């Protein structure tokens, strides 16, 4: 459980060449697509009434391959070595961009459209391998940081491609500039891909099914047939792209009609939104404690709604002028700042929302299904984006809503969709409550938690100071833990939801309720036999004076039935807090106090006697109660 910064990945060959390759791909997608749209709108000789039709055709041609070829991309990602597959896709990109370059140089719209469809196909085939290679290249504790960097790179590349297209298309020799830019970027992407280390095929024996319609349906069913946490994460991921597509497509018109701005204002808003997502994606690693922390998803969802509502509420505050505002003039208006802050906030919380979802899908999907499940995610993403376009047409055209009112509808829909997801998968809410507690009421620090094994069974033993010990431990330790706790604590209102969802084990004294007592030991043995972590509080009760009480003999029974390593833990700084039994406690007395979790070296079964364990835990805790 090493705790290195996500930025160290940029210095490692197992990540950096892939990061450069995927970022250049996202950049080139948007450089070419946006250049083509600008050419249709301002450069090519077309009937004025036809231009909007051609622009909409561009959107269709780019997204159609995700429906047609994502299933093939999923199969390819499992049958072939991922490094070789990426190189083949990037080599094809050079040919596709050569066709597009020829189209620009000759003003041949048909060639440009063929190239656009080709780039959509390139992205549809690249998507499954893009996300399924990460768990092969990264350790589990690096997965959130790696996904954060990928999302940051993707959205900044999208922004750079969009801006780059505008710069190139404004030059007199735009055709040459675009042609050289897209082909040159494709070549650089291929060269970067040659440095990606070997990523072996996970199912080389797979027989490819070339029936794209049959396979698309089968893969979509596979994705949505995963565990509820994975399948609803796929839905949540697609919902993010639904929301993002609406905001991104409306930004140009919003900047013109509601911010009364020129083209520089459009660029400013796009920049703020993209930088916000990049920032939120990067912050995920720090906020999650370098583990797959799905508790950030409800937090991100809350922010998406809050800042969407703020954006709607403050729209209309910016006054019009004789000439459109440029970006500097807009920044000088106090009325615009709430809108701009809302846009950044949307991006930041969007990053909090999407990165943990991607990481969960990767971490909890079987290796031999991962690429196909991600392909299913891409198919659903495309479907949600098409539905978002249809909904936008209906609400803005038929219902005659304004753009801010559309943002209001999206913000309210976000509440409904995520309430459904969190109801089906209460683990999201449970992890959010744990995350909120450990990041709001306390400043939780930890030492030597790398002593807890990354995999395999172990028994954790810890002193028992407060009603929230299990929540704090669960929030700090990367692996899921099954806690054994006194049944009356387990049944506490609100907390019972958290404990039950986490699979905690209620226990009573043998003389108090023998059925609960025996059932608890049976479940402990079951969890340990399955290779999970189980945590017990051997005192059997909360401390009444802050000191560590006698450890009871239940640990002997556990280890006799299922011999596993024992890891001693100690909680420091919780005594006197609101959730302890200190008579002098108060809600604000130790609010935001420093709490430390310390792990000791593993103790072999034969040495794990109650008195010896108590001595180890006492030594770890020291004098800090």
Give the label of every model feature segment:
Residues 176-194, 405-419:
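Symmetry-related core transmembrane helices of the 12-TM Major Facilitator Superfamily/SLC fold
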Residues 16-34, 58-96, 111-170, 186, ...:
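Substrate-agnostic recognition of the 12-TM MFS/MFS-like secondary transporter fold
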Residues 454-514:
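Catalytic core of membrane glycerolipid acyltransferases/transacylases, capturing the structured
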Residues 132, 136-137, 182-209, 315-318, ...:
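Helix-loop junctions on the cytosolic side of multi-pass membrane transporters
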Residues 2-16, 198-235, 258, 324-332:
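Juxtamembrane intracellular "pre-TM" segments in multi-pass secondary transporters
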Residues 533, 544-611:
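A cross-family acyltransferase "interaction/gating" segment
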Residues 91-107, 302-332:
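C-terminal ends and interior cores of transmembrane alpha-helices
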Residues 35-46, 100-106, 159-182, 257-258, ...:
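Transmembrane alpha-helix termini and helix-breaking/packing motifs in multi-pass membrane transporters
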């Amino acid at each position: 459980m090493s705790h290195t910064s996500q930025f160290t990945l940029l210095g490692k060959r197992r990540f950096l060449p892939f990061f450069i390759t995927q970022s250049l791909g996202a950049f080139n997608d948007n450089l070419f697509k946006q250049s083509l749209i600008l050419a249709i709108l301002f450069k090519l000789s077309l009937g004025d009434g036809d231009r909007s039709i051609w622009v909409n055709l561009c959107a269709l041609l780019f997204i159609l391959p995700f429906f047609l070829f994502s299933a093939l991309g999923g199969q390819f990602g499992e049958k072939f070595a991922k490094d070789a597959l990426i190189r083949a896709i990037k080599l094809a990109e050079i040919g596709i961009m050569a066709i597009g370059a020829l189209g620009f140089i000759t003003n041949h719209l048909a060639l440009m459209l063929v190239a656009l469809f080709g780039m959509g196909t390139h992205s549809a085939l690249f998507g499954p391998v893009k996300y399924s290679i990460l768990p092969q290249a990264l350790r589990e504790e690096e997965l959130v940081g790696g996904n954060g960097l990928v999302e940051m790179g993707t959205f900044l590349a999208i922004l750079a491609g969009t801006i780059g297209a505008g710069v190139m298309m404004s030059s007199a020799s735009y055709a040459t500039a675009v042609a050289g830019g897209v082909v040159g970027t494709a070549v650089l992407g291929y060269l970067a891909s040659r440095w990606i280390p070997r990523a072996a095929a996970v199912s080389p024996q797979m027989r490819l099914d070339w029936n794209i319609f049959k396979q698309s349906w089968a893969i979509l069913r596979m994705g949505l047939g995963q565990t509820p946490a994975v399948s609803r994460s796929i839905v949540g991921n697609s919902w993010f792209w639904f929301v993002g597509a609406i905001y991104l497509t409306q930004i140009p018109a919003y900047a013109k009609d509601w911010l009364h701005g020129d083209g520089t204002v459009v660029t400013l808003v796009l920049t703020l939104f993209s930088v916000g997502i990049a920032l939120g994606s990067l912050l995920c690693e720090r906020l999650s404690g370098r583990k797959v922390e799905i508790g950030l998803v409800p937090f991100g969802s809350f922010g998406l709604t809050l800042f969407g509502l703020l954006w709607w509420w403050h729209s209309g505050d910016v006054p019009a002028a004789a000439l459109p505002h440029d970006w500097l003039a807009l920044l000088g208006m106090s009325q615009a700042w709430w809108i701009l802050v809302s846009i950044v906030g949307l991006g930041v919380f969007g990053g909090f929302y999407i990165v943990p979802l991607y990481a969960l899908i990767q971490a909890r999907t079987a290796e031999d299904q991962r690429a196909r499940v991600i392909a299913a995610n891409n198919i659903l993403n495309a479907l949600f984006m098409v539905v978002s376009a249809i909904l936008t047409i209906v609400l803005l055209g038929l219902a005659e809503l304004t753009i801010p009112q559309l943002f209001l509808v999206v913000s309210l829909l976000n509440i409904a969709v995520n309430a459904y997801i969190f109801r089906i998968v209460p683990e999201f809410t449970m992890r959010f409550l744990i995350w909120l507690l450990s990041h709001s009421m306390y400043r939780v620090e930890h030492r030597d938690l790398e002593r807890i094994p990354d995999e395999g069974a172990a028994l954790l033993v810890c002193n028992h100071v407060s009603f929230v010990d299990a929540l704090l431990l669960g929030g700090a330790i990367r692996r899921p833990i099954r806690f054994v706790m006194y049944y009356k604590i387990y049944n506490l209102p609100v907390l019972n939801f958290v404990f039950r969802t986490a699979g905690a084990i209620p226990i009573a004294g043998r003389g108090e309720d023998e059925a609960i007592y025996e059932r608890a030991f049976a479940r402990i043995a079951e969890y340990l036999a399955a290779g999970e972590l189980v945590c017990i509080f051997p005192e059997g009760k909360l401390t009444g004076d802050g000191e560590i009480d006698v450890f009871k003999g239940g640990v002997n029974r556990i280890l006799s039935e299922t011999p596993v390593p024992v890891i001693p833990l100690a909680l420091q700084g919780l005594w006197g807090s609101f959730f302890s039994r200190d008579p002098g406690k108060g809600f604000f007395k130790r609010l935001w106090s420093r709490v430390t979790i310390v792990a000791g070296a593993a103790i072999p079964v034969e040495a794990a006697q109650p008195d010896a364990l108590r001595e180890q835990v006492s030594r770890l805790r020291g004098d800090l109660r």
